[in-house]
């Protein structure tokens, strides 16, 4: 199973939790059954700690940046099964990564933090975990790896959800007339 993290790489986005959950799953014998790829800018002052932890895990890799301004970026993102988003960053608002995940059909494991429950739907586009809970993250990842979660159905739900944010569905002729642009 292929997990992905796509955001700023920093502790407050849950990166340490992902790495610890990965380590625990590896200790339980799941190492050859999943991978975790990280994309994003590594926060200043976190590079050494992050690299030390990720380099100790054979199935976790830093992939650099994913260009989502090009279709190929979304094609690459769609190769993943689940996105990991165990954030507790106090500045978290409407995370644009949700739309990226929806477009690519990638459901996520996310914390019950900030506005996540307003945008994501438990069991359809996401699986929720409590904030600051590595064991809950590990368990949700294990359920996905073991096939206990219908990821394919969730992927379809994500793609359906993406339609709500498609500019062609949002900016209609009726809206343009209403705001007197047409």
Regions found by a protein language model. Give the residues of each.
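A charged, aromatic-enriched C-terminal amphipathic alpha-helix characteristic of glycosyltransferases
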Residues: 149-179
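Short alpha-helical segment that forms part of, or immediately flanks, the ligand-binding pocket
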Residues: 74, 96-103, 114-118
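Conserved acidic donor-binding segment of nucleotide-sugar-dependent glycosyltransferases
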Residues: 122-123, 127-134, 143-148
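Short acidic alpha-helix that forms the nucleotide-activated donor recognition element
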Residues: 68-80, 103, 121
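Nucleotide-activated donor-binding/catalytic signature segment of Leloir-type glycosyltransferases, i.e.
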Residues: 48-69
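A structural motif in glycosyltransferase catalytic domains
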Residues: 3, 18-21, 36, 137, ...
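A conserved mid-protein helix/loop that constitutes part of the nucleotide-sugar donor-binding site
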Residues: 1, 10-24, 135
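Short hydrophobic beta-strand element within catalytic cores of glycosyltransferases
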Residues: 84, 103, 107-110
């Amino acid at each position: 199973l292929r997990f992905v993290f796509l955001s700023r790489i920093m502790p407050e986005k849950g990166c340490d939790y992902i790495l610890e959950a990965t380590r625990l799953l590896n200790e339980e014998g799941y190492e050859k059954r999943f991978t975790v790829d990280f994309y994003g800018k590594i926060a200043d002052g976190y590079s050494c700690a992050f690299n030390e932890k990720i380099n100790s895990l054979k199935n976790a890799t830093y992939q650099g940046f994913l260009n989502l301004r090009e279709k190929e970026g979304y094609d690459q993102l769609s190769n993943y099964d689940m996105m990991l988003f165990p954030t507790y960053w106090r500045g978290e608002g409407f995370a644009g990564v949700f739309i990226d995940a929806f477009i690519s059909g990638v459901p996520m494991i996310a914390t019950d933090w900030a506005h996540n429950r307003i945008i994501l739907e438990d069991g359809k586009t996401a699986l929720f975990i409590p904030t600051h809970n590595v064991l809950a993250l590990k368990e949700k990842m294990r359920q996905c790896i073991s096939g206990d979660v219908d990821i394919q159905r969730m992927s379809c739900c994500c793609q359906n959800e993406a339609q709500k944010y498609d500019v062609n569905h949002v900016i209609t002729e009726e809206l343009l007339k209403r705001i007197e642009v047409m």
